[in-house]
Design a protein with these regions (language model features):
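Short polar catalytic/cofactor-binding loops
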Residues: 14-15, 28
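Surface-exposed loops/turns
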Residues: 16-17, 79
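Surface-exposed edge beta-strand/loop patches
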Residues: 73-158
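Asparagine-centered strand-capping/turn motif at beta-strand->loop junctions
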Residues: 24-33
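Structural beta-strand segments of beta-rich domains
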Residues: 18-22
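Generic beta-strand hydrophobic packing signal
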Residues: 11-13, 39, 43, 50-52, ...
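N-terminal edge beta-strand
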Residues: 1-14
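The feature marks short-to-medium sequence segments in extracytoplasmic or secretory-pathway proteins
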Residues: 33-82
Length: 158
């Protein structure tokens, strides 16, 4: 019996007319079904290095408003098999701009993530299905994860 975790391979990144498409192949070499987060939970982009990091995991994710917690979409990959996951992202993102001094008005900055030259993907996974715990003081969703699969790809500028 093998008890390996989820394995990820970033197959392709390409810019479409209205989106950035990222295709990830996930594999399961274990003897039981694995469950994984199947949607992007956070996008980190560094315009200076053109590094894009997609997190399909809630580990380390800082929520501004606890009520904003939305449960992710989950998928499964059967024992000794593979599956493909297609992620469709906007070509640009808008985020709060860092400010040297406090200001009552927030500033925003737009970044074109389709210009990324390095793409990394993290996928949270578990050996057990996720069930929401409605009890008070329940474990946070990221406690469900047994591990995180990582994949990266260097993208050649066109």
């Amino acid at each position: 019996m093998t008890d390996a975790g989820l394995v990820a391979h970033l197959r392709s990144v390409r810019e479409l007319d209205d989106a950035l498409e990222v295709v990830v192949d996930v594999g399961n070499d274990s003897d039981r079904t694995l469950h994984y987060v199947a949607e992007v939970r956070a996008i980190d982009y560094d315009p200076a290095t053109r590094r894009l990091r997609l997190r399909l995991s809630d580990r380390g994710r800082q929520l501004v408003i606890e009520a904003a917690m939305v449960e992710p979409t989950f998928r499964t990959v059967e024992p000794h098999s593979e599956a493909s996951l297609v992620l469709s992202l906007p070509r640009t993102i808008v985020r709060l701009a860092p400010q040297a001094e406090r200001s009552p008005e927030p500033r925003f900055e737009e970044h074109r993530i389709a210009d990324a030259t390095e793409v990394e993907v993290e996928i949270g996974w578990s050996r057990t299905p996720y069930y929401a715990d409605v009890r008070a003081r329940a474990e946070p969703p990221e406690a469900w994860e047994d591990g995180t699969a990582h994949a990266s790809l260097t993208v050649r500028p066109e």
